[in-house]
């Protein structure tokens, strides 16, 4: 009984640990991103975060390719979100303001959204058609 309980506890603790960040590249720039691929991870997003490292963000993988929407409830950081198609090509970038509950959507269908500190894409002149490399193969 104790062995089974100990094993269950170890499995639970192991699965609760944070996964390693993804190493991504876009237009010659390297970045790290947490990977939000489940509904719960996407719903939580970057809520409550007070800061992001300079070249760090969160990559959201959506279950289907379509126009996707984001909001900033309980998110104190100004962010830019880039939307990418199934092929990793950037299709849209939007800026998001802290704590704003207005729902903002991509203009075109996307599989992924990458949230970074606001202005990250503009400062690097990364726009539509840029390819995001390093996305995990599902």
Protein language model annotation of sequence segments:
Residues 4-14:
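Bacterial N-terminal signal peptides
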Residues 19-138:
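Compact, glycine-rich, soluble single-domain proteins
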